[in-house]
Curated annotation (Swiss-Prot):
Keywords tagged on the record: Acyltransferase, Cytoplasm, Iron, Metal-binding, Transferase, tRNA processing
Lineage of source species: Bacteria, Pseudomonadati, Campylobacterota, Epsilonproteobacteria, Campylobacterales
Residues that coordinate or bind Fe cation: 111, 115, 304
Residue runs in coiled coils: none
Organism: Helicobacter pylori (strain G27)
Family (UniProt): Belongs to the KAE1 / TsaD family.
Catalysed reactions listed for this entry: L-threonylcarbamoyladenylate + adenosine(37) in tRNA = N(6)-L-threonylcarbamoyladenosine(37) in tRNA + AMP + H(+)
GO CC aspect terms: cytoplasm
Cellular compartments annotated: Cytoplasm
Annotated protein name in UniProt: tRNA N6-adenosine threonylcarbamoyltransferase
């Protein structure tokens, strides 16, 4: 089995993945959302301290799953990029300590690659090549995935990420953090879902394949300020619905542009923001239009987790992509290549 560790942002997670058949044997996670909610976003120093508390607790649960028989482990895998440096280092220190004390090889995993492999948790076979939309609090990307070692970024955000824009809109409406499920509920509760969009769809006439949410976010801010004296629940629902609809339509328009160029046969959607049901439905329709198979990460494995890191690290294990402890380090940025 491989013991995998995830600590790139505000989720502490450990998992055990069986090498022979890619089955997830154990998965434990502690979220920090309640600790960061009053700040309207993740506070790096607080997140680091909480990882230092939570990771050892999760390791104790792993020990129980193993019946304290560490001979079942064949490798230690850790997310080392991208993410918050102060949280990545907490996971890396644990991974190095385990690797050294148990005399096990160390695997360093890219967090974005891990999200791609969330599509294949509990599955030995993958369906590569495929294209993938990754939407989260930190990223909005289209990836072309040929195999484990050949993943390229073909589109990214020029400013805010999809998930980050939901957090900021929720904060404008004084509704808390994380904003994704809060704004999604506003949209679901809105009583007039078929009216024309009140906010502009970003980059609608741009020739570039990219994402941008700053202009949409600013349009929401102006609407909130205009309604500030009477910002009741109905107005918040209307703003939430129209913001979410414009944000998803932006993703659809840009992905449709990509589809027309590349015509992928298989398209995956991953990342924490891919839990949004309206987004999933919109992409189901898009993939039907282009006769493209849609694959979705299970809802429980959309947000950051060690299970996806364990699944991706199986590929590294088979290729013997191990890293000496003295060369193991972290990076706040991904080293995946971008198309020029």
């Amino acid at each position: 089995m491989i013991l995998s560790i995830e600590s790139s942002c505000d989720d502490s997670s450990l998992a055990l993945t069986r090498i022979e058949d890619a089955k997830l044997i154990a998965h434990f996670k502690i979220s920090q959302e309640k600790h960061h909610s009053s700040y309207g976003g993740v506070v790096p120093e607080l997140a680091s301290r909480l990882h230092a508390e939570n990771l050892p607790l999760l390791l104790e649960r792993i020990k129980i799953s193993l019946n304290k028989d560490f001979s079942k482990l064949k490798a230690i895998a850790i997310t080392n990029q991208p993410g918050l440096s102060v949280t990545l280092i907490e996971g890396l220190m644990m991974a190095k300590a385990l690797s050294l004390s148990l005399n096990l090889p160390l695997i360093l995993e890219d967090h974005l690659r891990g999200h791609v492999y969330s599509l294949f948790i509990n599955e030995k076979q993958t369906c590569m090549p495929l294209s993938v939309l990754l939407v989260s609090g930190g990223h909005s990307l289209i990836l072309e995935v040929r195999d484990y070692e050949d993943i390229k970024i073909v589109a990214t955000s020029l400013d805010d990420s999809f998930g980050e824009s939901f957090d900021k809109v929720s904060k404008m409406l004084d509704l808390g953090y994380p904003g994704g499920p809060i704004v999604e509920k506003l949209a679901l509760d809105y009583a007039h879902p078929n009216e024309p969009l009140m906010f502009p769809v970003p980059l609608k006439n741009s020739p570039n394949l990219a994402f941008s949410f700053s202009g949409l976010k600013n349009a929401v801010r102006l609407e909130v300020e205009k309604n500030a004296p009477n910002l009741n629940e109905k107005i918040k629902q209307k703003i939430g619905y129209h913001f979410q609809s414009a944000a998803i339509e932006h993703l659809i328009q840009q992905t449709k542009r990509y589809f027309k160029i590349k015509r992928p046969k298989i398209f995956g959607i991953v990342g924490g923001a891919s839990q949004n049901l309206a987004l999933r439905k919109a992409f189901e329709n898009l993939c039907v239009e282009f006769d493209c198979k849609l694959v979705l990460a299970p809802l429980e494995f959309c947000s950051d987790n060690a299970a996806m890191i364990g699944r991706s690290s199986l590929e590294a294990y088979q290729k013997k992509r191990f890293v000496p402890l003295e060369k193991a380090n972290i990076s706040p940025r991904t080293l995946l290549k971008s198309f020029e």
